Regions:
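Terminal helix/beta-alpha structural elements that buttress the NAD(P)+-binding lobe
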Residues: 16-18, 106, 120, 140
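Structural micro-motif
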Residues: 100-102, 115-119, 130-139
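Short, acidic, Ser/Thr-enriched surface-loop or helix-capping motifs
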Residues: 23, 141-143
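Conserved small/polar residues in nucleotide/adenosyl-binding loops
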Residues: 145-147
Length: 147
């Protein structure tokens, strides 16, 4: 599943770039620092049949990070309990098995009442198609500049 958005399409006064997220490293990321970039947000899991997509995500990160693409992985255990590990275990798994260097967030819910505000924003702004139905759902947020 893939959701594709242009932040300028929203009627919601809050944007993606007004939000924050905690990283798996323990640091906080203010998403306003990513203005002017294109964001690929992916809910991820270590024990999923789609986990091999980490290789592709890392390749995208390496190929396009200098051209304005930011890949963010958001671990979630909401689909089949396929991300049961601690954040330390998730980080080690990703680095050891896939040499992940793109941003990874803390583990969050990505659907329902306790979903991370990014996913609540996406659903309220763009509708139900943004709600992940399984692991490795992708949301692409374009940051277009209009003159």
């Amino acid at each position: 599943m893939f959701s594709f958005f242009n932040k300028t399409m929203s009627n919601n006064t809050e944007t993606f770039f007004d939000l924050n997220v905690n990283l798996i490293s323990g640091d906080a990321l203010n998403l306003s620092k990513l203005k002017g970039k294109t964001i690929l947000l992916v809910n991820v899991a270590s024990n999923c049949g789609f986990t091999k997509q980490y290789d592709d995500l890392q390749n995208l990160h390496e190929s396009y990070k200098n051209k304005g693409l930011v890949v963010i992985g958001m671990p979630s255990n909401q689909f089949g309990g396929q991300e049961p590990g601690s954040e330390k275990e998730i980080k080690k798994f990703c680095e050891t098995n896939f040499n992940i260097t793109f941003q990874m967030t803390s583990k969050y819910d990505v659907k329902g009442d306790n979903a991370h505000p990014i996913y609540i924003w996406a659903k309220e702004t763009f509708g139900k198609s943004t709600v992940p139905k399984w692991n490795f759902h992708k949301i692409l947020i374009l940051s277009l500049i209009h003159i």
